[in-house]
Design a protein with these regions (language model features):
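Membrane-embedded alpha-helical bundles that constitute the cytochrome b-like, heme-associated redox core
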Residues: 1-275
Length: 275
């Protein structure tokens, strides 16, 4: 997987910008980009967990459509729309960097320089594509066609990855965290893209409710909620275990993370089922 001249130009520009940030430049020079990307993966993961809660709180207002529409009216200002676009950066970075780690861990690909270049190039292409759709604001696609296509791709990728890691000596919890990551690598960027094809798709209660009441879309949403909650919870557990030495504190952390994730799953499943 050689980096093309286009990806090299894109990533050189991105590296040039990042190297102007003193903190980033210092650690990239002294610890390497692999260290920076590792911490970036953890930080973006935490940001996305916070966004998950915000998303659940927002969607809970769908039980009263008028209240939901009133809230969404507050999110129509140019500043909020710009912040929504910025949120795509941690979304796609976490997804694509997760793919890089999987290639490294399980498929033996060791050209990390090329993978890092592709990470930044793909991320840049995604946020630019999203910016185009958000600027146009008039795109549409059949929800059934879109999610059937995306869901099949995600399931096929997840199954192929499961076949790769099934015989490894790790626990089922560890394996499912990786499989859920492959599934979400496809689903979450697609979800983010779909929700910004036009303002009505993500901000008009009638449009959202009509889509979520479709049986197949409801099943897709349920699968996505469970995968996101599990992947997030196991990620928090893994990060905490790296820094918490005490066995008692590890148990306490595990209980707290499990409780928060069960609560998140309950809220998410209730929203999807009741709509």
């Amino acid at each position: 997987m050689q980096a093309s001249s286009i990806s090299v130009k894109i990533t050189d520009r991105i590296f040039g910008i990042l190297n102007r940030i003193p903190y980033v430049a210092f650690y990239a020079r002294t610890r390497g980009w692999e260290f920076m990307l590792s911490w970036g993966h953890r930080i973006t993961g935490l940001l996305l967990i916070l966004y998950l809660w915000f998303h659940l709180i927002t969607l809970s207002a769908l039980s009263i459509p008028g209240e939901y529409d009133a809230k969404m009216a507050l999110f129509s200002s140019p500043l909020i729309v710009f912040l929504e676009w910025l949120l795509a950066i941690p979304v796609i970075f976490h997804a694509v960097n997760g793919g890089r780690l999987m290639l490294f861990e399980f498929f033996g690909y060791r050209d990390d320089t090329a993978m890092i270049r592709w990470l930044f190039a793909v991320s840049a292409a995604y946020v630019c594509l999203l910016a185009v759709f958000m600027f146009l604001g008039n795109q549409s696609v059949s929800p059934i066609f879109f999610w059937l296509t995306v869901f099949l791709i995600a399931v096929i990728c997840g199954y192929a990855f499961l076949a790769r890691i099934w015989r490894l000596g790790h626990s089922p919890f560890w394996k499912f965290q990786r499989i859920s990551g492959v599934f979400l690598l496809v689903m979450i960027p697609a979800h983010f893209l779909f929700m910004h094809l036009n303002p009505a798709v993500g901000k008009e209660s009638a449009v959202i409710i009509a889509r979520m009441q479709n049986f197949f879309v409801k099943m897709v949403d349920l699968a996505m909620v469970l995968a996101v909650v599990y992947h997030s919870g196991y990620g928090l557990f893994s990060v905490g275990k790296d820094y918490i030495v005490s066995r008692r504190l590890q148990i306490l952390m595990t209980v707290l993370v499990a409780a928060v994730m069960v609560l998140s799953a309950w809220i998410g499943l209730k929203i999807v089922i009741r709509v």
